[in-house]
């Protein structure tokens, strides 16, 4: 079985500071948002400042330990929003190009062993390339 990070490297994608977003939800399910072409906007609305990273690897829960690869998004910025008794964070993101052949087509086997919906990491830069 091939690992997702290996598949991304084959596609020429090398990530620096990233978080894995394990998208779940019942009120407005992320899978519905994905198939209705509004997942990017769905993901950009957060109750906390969850995406303190350069890139987001988005996975949408399907069942048990199966997750749909929903793309990689570059984090462009964040704005804290307030309205009456409500507060949230609105992210600006840009979907990484060149992954159309994988997005929505790859099912990742991943056993989530943590409570938060986000898992952070810093990936190695490819040999011979400077880190930004």
Residue map of PLM features:
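Contiguous surface segments at macromolecular interaction interfaces
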Residues: 1-11, 19-23, 65-70, 78-132
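Short connector loops at helix/strand junctions that flank enzyme active sites
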Residues: 51-54, 68-70
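Compositionally biased, charged N-terminal/linker segments
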Residues: 1-53, 130-132
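Short conserved beta-strand and strand-loop elements enriched in small hydrophobics
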Residues: 54-64
């Amino acid at each position: 079985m091939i690992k997702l990070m290996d598949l991304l490297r084959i596609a020429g994608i090398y990530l620096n500071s990233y978080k894995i977003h394990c998208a779940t939800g019942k009120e407005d399910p992320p899978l519905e948002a994905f198939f209705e072409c509004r997942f990017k906007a769905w993901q950009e609305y957060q109750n906390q400042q969850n995406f303190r990273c350069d890139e987001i690897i988005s996975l949408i829960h399907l069942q048990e330990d199966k997750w749909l690869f929903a793309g990689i998004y570059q984090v462009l910025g964040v704005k804290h929003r307030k309205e009456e008794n409500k507060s949230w964070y609105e992210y600006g993101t840009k979907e990484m190009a060149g992954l159309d052949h994988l997005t929505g087509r790859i099912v990742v086997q991943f056993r989530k062993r943590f409570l938060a919906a986000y898992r952070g990491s810093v990936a190695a830069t490819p040999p011979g390339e400077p880190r930004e």
